[in-house]
Each structure stands twice: as C-alpha cells, then as structure tokens.
C-alpha cells in the first residue's frame, strides 16, 4: 500500500463525490488519495486483475469517474527496469482495450495516461524518469485531436469535472471543448 498524506485541499475526486457523482477507484487509487473522495474502491493484485475489474465496472450503470491504476507498469517493470515485462504488459493492455471500448456508452470518455515517467530501459537509477507522459482520450463522441503539451494533471481534472458538469476551481485548463 501507498501511505499518502491527506491532500491539503479538495481534489477532483472530492468535488465529484460531493456533487453526488460516482468516484470509483481500481487498484491503489484509494491509497494514493489517502482514502478521500471515493464512493467505491477495489484493490487489485496486478494489471491482469485491474483490467478484469475495470471491464466489470464498464458493465455497470454509473455516472461519474472510474479511476484505474495498473500498478505493474510502475512497480514490476518500470522501477525494476524490465523492458521485456513492460512490453508484455503493454501488449496485454493493447489486446484488452478494444473489448473495453466496445462497452462504452455514447457519452463516455476514457483518458489513458501515466502519473510519471518510468523508463524501463534507463539504468542509472530506479527512480522516476523525466520524459513527458502520453495522454490519449477515447470515446464514441471524442474527436481525434492533438492536444499538444499540457500544463499538467490539473488540465485532466478540469476536463473531467467539466465533462461531468461539476464546477471545480483548479489551475488547470479544460480541453473538453476540443474533444467533444
């Protein structure tokens, strides 16, 4: 488990929960946010379990956010500098994704990203690495558009809350209008 400090202010999860939206954590999301802002959460034993649990949530009718952490990318392959394991995990995810996307509703949006760089091929240390992280938005009504380099995760929080119709004061700039 991660033993995080309580966030000093309301997070996106807090404001969504306060607005009556579902905030579902899969993996260690509950721990990352010190147990705050979750209406429901489930731990996972690794990526394969996380993908299965995420697919199960896609079958449920909820209005809100399902926030997923696939920990093996970081814990088993990134920090352990295991590029072969990382590649196999990416292939597993790539094989899983089409079945998940088929389950999405008309207005659903999926944002795929990472929380930091963790190059499995970098050998000087096992800490986080400094490359930019990818962010991909998908959904039946999501337009394919280059969003450029974003300021940070605050842009994702601004976008998610706007898409869910919940006001949230954040330094982030929503890119919802560019997507839908």
Question: Where in the sequence are the language-model features?
Answer:
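Feature captures the catalytic ectodomains and active-site-proximal regions of enzymes
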Residues: 1-180
